[in-house]
Amino acid sequence: HYVFLCCPESDLQGRMQQPFNLETWIESHPQYRQYFERLPRHPQEYWRPFYNVTCSSWSKGRVCIVGDAAHGMAPNLGQGAGVAIVNAVVLSRILAKERDVPAALRKWEASERPYVDKTQRMSYLYGAVGTRWPRSILDVRSKLLPLLSRADIWQRSLRVALDHKPAV
């Protein structure tokens, strides 16, 4: 099982919970009590920060990297694995048609990189809204997020990976 619960990096109490402190999370989010109480416990629970992995290039010569090695992102949007799978499928399609491997890899990255980069940026932004928002204006976030969630431009931005249709 995998559960992703985030807290600000500055929240030492949230980060250092080993094991997971159920009561702290229920106190912070009482509306989710029923879900927190159903979480299975595991003796190896731990907190780790997430990092975006951004490479200047996904390939060199006849070698490439895919998935988290090329563009790791925090699971804020739940898109990392899907993006990696789509990248691999597109890569296989291009390699099946193109004999020049370095050229195929360049074509693949040119095709996939724009939507991957945008997905990564939106994942970071979504996480930052949740964990880096200034405490002094949390009430603003609480009013802003419901409005944003109804805006088409926000929804399209969050769905960039879901809506991606590979050209290859």
Give residue spans per PLM region.
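Conserved FAD/dinucleotide-binding core of flavoprotein oxidoreductases
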Residues: 1-47
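Alpha-helical structural elements of signaling/regulatory helical domains
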Residues: 31, 97-100, 114, 132-136, ...
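Conserved mid-domain beta->alpha element of the FAD-binding
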Residues: 44-125
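Crotonase-superfamily enoyl-CoA hydratase/isomerase domain that binds
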Residues: 121-138
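C-terminal auxiliary extensions adjacent to catalytic cores
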Residues: 142-168
